[in-house]
Amino acid sequence: MTVGIPLAILDRPEGKHDIILQFSGVQWTIYIDGRLYDNDFALGYPLASRMKLWSLNPDYVSEANLYEPAIQPEQIAAPTPQIASNIQYWTPPYHNAWVGDVVTFFHDGRYHVFYLFDRRGHASKFGRGGHYFEHLSTTDFQTWVEHKPATPLEYQWETFGTGTPFLFNGKLCISYGLHTTRIYPKEETTLPMQWTYLEKNGYTGSFNYDTIQGLVPAGSTYSISEDGVTNFKKTHILYHPCENPSIYTDPDGNLKMLANYGARGTWKADSVNGGWKCLDADFPLGGDCTFFFRWGEYDYIIGGFTRLWSKLAKDPEFAYKDVVVEGTDFYNGLSVPAITEIPGGRFLMAGWLKMQNWGGPLVIHELIQYPDGRIGTKWMDEIIPATGTPKKLSAKLTGTGDFPVSSKSFMLTFKVYPDQPRQGNLKVLFLPEKGEESACEWQLQLDKARAQYGTNLTATYASSEKTLREGGAPQTASNYAIENGIDTSKPFMVRILVDGSDKFGGSLIDTEIAAQRTMISYRPELTVGNLRFCMEGISVQDISLAPLSD
């Protein structure tokens, strides 16, 4: 196991630095000049028999000491906020630290974001993930608070999977899965015992894993907030053998759960602490994390990376239809999106954008709903990144136009005017300063109400990418297409936000089309230096570019 950082990320790489490497029994943590920079979670302990000799290079190390017991860190307030006022595209401010699966909840005037803290793209803890829930919240979407971890890792056998926040008996709770089978064989965990109980009784049992001898805890558990905001305490109760439990209270007040990873189906209970009975063994399908929400006259279940179902709220449970098969889903490049209602009848979708194997920046978009229940997406006004003074690039453009870009992070806006309703094509090429090696093409086909990200190194339009219905993979945040839900019969606005950073190792491109659909992509190794517009059957007007504010 290696714990460390590139010295170049320090504010002052040269000169003398005080370095502390601490082992807590659960994790190794490296502190440099009093600040935490990296950690990883242990499996096993250092062998004293192999630690008799230390090799230190005096050209780099002037003094070294071993402390037993270990020096204990003391947490102090940071001199500057660690969370920017704008949360969009945020990542934890540490080396190789990312947002993993996101679950959200609105309670008592506060929007909560719980996210699996990810380092190394799921490669921490020797590839077992080492995930746990960190916690952010806001009351106004402008000021964000970073709370203590909701589910810290306290034992070497712990590594957690996704669940959901929910209310039970008036208390804020969060369910999550113990992904212990990534470390131990299933036979050495509590899962066989839990499945046996379920098969014998027809409902799940309730087990306090502190009282179980000889088996490692696995399955579903939950934590309870002691103050309704933060300060979560683990219950140590195992209540179901699934390892990604999505608990929610339905609109009729019933406690339900969608079982994922290791189980499937819809379940119901009177209490979180066991007694869960299966209502439908085959739906949802399990696997990815699933979330239920009701919006007006419609019920929806969104399932992880690629699944979405809906039905009229008045219809029975078996009436859910596959929205993806119909081609009317609203997946837009995010992974494992979670949906939450906020005041004003608004719904937010939060997820992570794939930049690592299992992590990236946090992204929040707002949903829109049509009378037939179809859902689209748009940017959320309150969290659009601030920009500097916009510069008009062109009042009107037909054919082709090229424009240099001086800022690697910017917002591009323009209006599309079709010559004929629902006719025409447009592409915008995002080019590096020199050459076309890492270029990205965003393309819009008005006749098909279809848009895509693609790779184009030619003068023509890139070949068609696949939508989710067609077998495409929007969740990769690379090349993909979206279809339907865009009204191209009249002029409309397009806004594109490009965020390039050294940490990203490239650029994020987030596009909003007519405030009806959004799509987002990550382009590694691309720093945009030039823009190229090409179009047929349309004109583009009021092209403006504004740099993002620091």
Task: Please report, for each region that a protein language model flagged, where it lies by residue.
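Carbohydrate-active catalytic/glycan-binding domains of CAZyme proteins
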Residues: 4-18, 24-31, 35-550
